[in-house]
């Protein structure tokens, strides 16, 4: 019996052997590896994490957990830092998390792919 993750997504592996939360994300990882091999992007990172810090203080949930954002991919394209998130279902906290990320990390371009 297949086990589904959140939102009925099936975990999948890309050709590079990374485990992803969905088939769509694994397909996008394969595409990005091809772009990197062709020299169109560089410094591809899988699942980078960004922690939200304001005025030198880490944002935390009431239970003490740090608040942050884990994207699917990060890479450099035409000299610009890009962090990319493959979205199937837009979850309810995404608009707020996106706004905080854009405000705290202005040197990154946040790209959403479907």
Q: Predicted regions span which residues?
A:
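Electrostatic, structured charged patches in enzyme active sites and in nucleic-acid/phosphate-binding
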Residues: 1-114
């Amino acid at each position: 019996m297949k086990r589904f993750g959140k939102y009925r997504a099936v975990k999948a592996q890309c050709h590079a052997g990374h485990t992803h939360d969905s088939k769509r994300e694994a397909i996008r990882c394969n595409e990005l590896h091809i772009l990197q091999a062709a020299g169109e992007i560089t410094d591809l990172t899988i699942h980078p994490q960004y922690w939200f810090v304001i005025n030198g203080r880490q944002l935390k949930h009431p239970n003490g957990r740090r608040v942050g954002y884990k994207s699917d991919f990060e890479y450099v394209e035409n000299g610009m830092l890009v962090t990319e998130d493959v979205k199937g279902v837009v979850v309810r906290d995404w608009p707020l998390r996106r706004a905080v990320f854009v405000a705290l990390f202005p040197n990154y371009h946040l790209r959403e792919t479907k």
